[in-house]
Structure formats: structure tokens, C-alpha cells
Amino acid sequence: MEAADASRSNGSSPEARDARSPSGPSGSLENGTKADGKDAKTTNGHGGEAAEGKSLGSALKPGEGRSALFAGNEWRRPIIQFVESGDDKNSNYFSMDSMEGKRSPYAGLQLGAAKKPPVTFAEKGELRKSIFSESRKPTVSIMEPGETRRNSYPRADTGLFSRSKSGSEEVLCDSCIGNKQKAVKSCLVCQASFCELHLKPHLEGAAFRDHQLLEPIRDFEARKCPVHGKTMELFCQTDQTCICYLCMFQEHKNHSTVTVEEAKAEKETELSLQKEQLQLKIIEIEDEAEKWQKEKDRIKSFTTNEKAILEQNFRDLVRDLEKQKEEVRAALEQREQDAVDQVKVIMDALDERAKVLHEDKQTREQLHSISDSVLFLQEFGALMSNYSLPPPLPTYHVLLEGEGLGQSLGNFKDDLLNVCMRHVEKMCKADLSRNFIERNHMENGGDHRYVNNYTNSFGGEWSAPDTMKRYSMYLTPKGGVRTSYQPSSPGRFTKETTQKNFNNLYGTKGNYTSRVWEYSSSIQNSDNDLPVVQGSSSFSLKGYPSLMRSQSPKAQPQTWKSGKQTMLSHYRPFYVNKGNGIGSNEAP
């Protein structure tokens, strides 16, 4: 048991201690060291350690050997991890002869390399799952050009966390001989992992009371300094990297250093703050997505109603066109019937005349058949006494006004299409081609939405110069008609011109009751007393109190909060109710 304890205090298990210790010239271990095959034990720790000290001292550079092997007045043996598990080929260790050997994958943490995020290690309890190791769905960036990410920070290396997590499931006990059991804890002092059976001395023995136990660690080399091979127990706040106690007196001398526990607590506080900020952003995005989902439904409902109105109006238009078509058709049929009746009358008259002529012809044929000359002459004289030449046939010309109907309908169709296209284009330019979704620029100075409410209503620009055209639209008396008036004269703001313009704009003509307009002394005085307004005019706002924007303090803006924000709501940006009388809180 004492031998086992001594081996644990030396940082390795009995099985892990092999013939890698430096030997003398004869190839055998000094001071009573026995060698049996490949494995050997040091019977005299002092002699063996002295020999190893010589070999290590020869490999170190001048000036480093003493600082590396001595701390104060006590000589310390460098802790070297020998892996006896199946991963021996992949183990990383330093050669006692050349100090080169296999390099640690964490060699980038040494001084002189580029600064990287600090390597963190698992503490007591379960290994923390990295928040960056989970798979993320691709997201659409909504960050505007020119903006900077407030929560931008270097991403941690997920490989270390994934290796630690996957390795903890396969770490084997370093003290088991033969069939190795699964390790349940790892000791940072012993630099070894133990199963439940071999962990009892650490739990029950007083000599191991100060040993720090953690969840099974697969690679102890990751906790060692790549320069000195010592356990990294300090954190350099200047270079933001883990160091050993030798680095504190050499490469990181005069740097601000703390223990890894203190640095971990500080980083955990920073991480908690970042998580809080991310949670607030998540809540904000969820609320914004919920709002836009409602806007999406509202847009669909609005479009459905507009489509119904479109269908109804065009259905009415088509019905009216069909009605007009039927009326034109009925007119054409009526005109046809009238013309046919007139032709029938003419044809009846012609038939009657033809009948009379046929009768005259038969009479003459009978007269021609008389053989008696006296009788023939008597009958012929009686016939010719009443005979007259038949009148000529009347001439008729049918005026078909419908011969130009095709051209008229073509012109009508072109005119109708032009009117439809003009109105449709007007509607499209007014509504369909407008950008319905605009970003709020309140953070850039000024509530542009508040300005747009007036510009959309009055057709003016808030940034227009201080001219009468800008302010006359707000001077409309109650019951009057709003009129925008702007004189063309450059000197329109002199005393006489201003009064004349206002008399023309708000005169006493019509049904409007006369009103005496009172002007301030700043306008009634001489021109030199007129205050100069920054801009393109010398218009005085003091003369018209109704033009002055209210300087009273604004009411406290209402806030729009979600039920998800019972905590940390003071970080939530509020939506401002602009006081437009509707009472709804609009989102940016």
C-alpha cells in the first residue's frame, strides 16, 4: 500500500512507470534500481531522481536548468505522463534527452504566437457542454451596412470541448492491471485517472485529502505548459492565456496574473452577461418575428380585400360594357327593321305600278286582235284619248350609317384602354410600387415617421425652408379650405408684402367671417428689426404663435412589453406611441 501511495504521489501508476527513466553508462539504473524486461521500479527515489536531474539538466539550456528544476531551496522532479492505454501512439510527451519529442497540439499558447482564445478546462462536476458545439440553423443576416455587432466576440474552439466530452466516456483507469476499468475521477496532483476501486485511497486516505479530483480527463498534456512542461495553474490577464508558475517569472514577468479559478470565475461572469444579452436579443427577435407574423397576416387580409374590390369593380365594369353592347345591338336591329320596312313599302308600290302596266298591255293586245278597220280605229281613238306616258320610276338611296361603326368601335376601344391604363398606372404608382416597409431611423436623429405623417397628409416636406408655403397649410381657420400660397417676389417677407399676402390668403370675401389678424411688433417694425431665420427667408415665427411648435415637455412614451419579459425588461428597447390619436404602439 505504501508503494502504491508513493507511486501516486509521484504522479504515475505502478503500471505507468516503465524503463523510460535515464540510465547510467552501463545501461542499468543507478543506486539499486532493478530492471525486469521493459518495466522497472526505482527502489531508491533519491538516487534515481538525482540521475534523472543530471540528464535533464544537460538537455536544458544554460540558465534554464536551475530555474526549471529548482524552486526555492527544494529540487522538484518534472512530472512526466506516460500513457499505458490503447492511445499510447497518440500520446504527447517530452523527451528527457532532447526536450523536443512530440509537440503538444496546444503549442500555439506559448509566448510569441498569435493570441488565441484562452483554453478552459472542466471543473468539478459534469463537463460543461459548450454552447458553441451545437449545430446551428443558417440564419439570414438583418444587420444593416455600417452597423457593428455589439456582441461580437471570438468564437471558442469547439474541438477542445468535443474532445473532452467524447474522451470522458472512454477514459480508463491508470492503476488497473490487465482488464482496465472505466475511470470515474481524475486527480490533478497525481496526473492519473482512477476507477471506483482505486479511487478509495483518495476518498479515505488523509494523504490525498488535498488532491483535486475532477471528472475523467483523457489528455493531461493539454493542462501542461508547452514550454516548461508544468501544470498551468495561472492565467495571464495581459496576454489572456494559461501559464505555469515558471512562465510567471520568465516570459510573463511583470504581467498581471491570477489563478485559473479566479480567471474562470471572471470569465463565467462575462459569459453570464453575454448569455443574458443573447437572451434579450432572442426575446427581442421573437417579439419582432411575432409582430411581423401579424403584419404578414394583415397584409394577406388587406390584399384579399383589395382583390375582392378589384374583382367586384371589374365585374361591374364588364357588366356595364355588356349592357352597352346590348344597347348598341338593339339599336342596330331597330335600324335594320326600319330600313326593311321602308324597302317593303317601295317594293309594294313598284308591284302596284307593275300590275297597272300589265293591265294596259293586255288592253292593247286585245285591240290589236280586231280585224275590222273602222272598229279598230274607233277603239284606238277612245284608248288614246285617256292615255298618258307612265311616270319615271323614283330613285332611292339607302343611307347605311353603320358603315363607319367598325372604325367608331375601334376608336372607342382605344379610348377605353387608354383611360383604363391611365387609371391603373396611377393606382400602381400610388400604391403598388410604393415601398410599404421602411426602416425606422429614430436612432439616427429625429422621428422620421412623425414627419412622414404630416408630409403624407399635406404633401409638403418637413425639411422645406421657412417660407409661407411651408407654414400656410397649418394656418387654415376652422371651417375654411386649406390653401398653400407662396408669392413669387423675392421680397415677399417685407412688412407690406407680408400683410398683403395674408390679406389675399385670408380675406373677407365669401362666406368666411371677417377676422382681424394681429401681428407681433417684430413684423410691424422696420425691416431692420426683422429677425433672420436660419434658412432662405426672414420669416418671423414670433408673429404667429400658432406656427410655433409646442415646447412643452413630451409625455413619457408608452412602452410595449411582452409577457416573456418579466425579467430584464429594462434592457428592452421600447416602441414609441407618437400620439397620433389612435392609441396604438407602433413597432419600428
Swiss-Prot record:
Q: Which PANTHER family match?
A: B-BOX DOMAIN CONTAINING, TRIPARTITE MOTIF-CONTAINING PROTEIN 29
Which species is this UniProt entry from?
A: Homo sapiens (Human)
In-chain residues carrying the UniProt-annotated modification Phosphoserine: S21, S28, S58, S104, S489
This protein's assembly is summarised as: Interacts with VIM and HINT1. Interacts with IKBKG/NEMO. Interacts with STING1.
Q: Does the keyword Electron transport apply?
A: no
What GO molecular-function term can you cite, just one?
Answer: p53 binding
Protein name in the entry: Tripartite motif-containing protein 29
Please list the residues that bind Zn(2+).
C225, H228, C247, H252
Q: How is it modified after translation?
A: Constitutively phosphorylated by PKC on serine/threonine in A431 cells.
Q: What GO CC annotations are associated with the protein?
A: adherens junction; lysosome
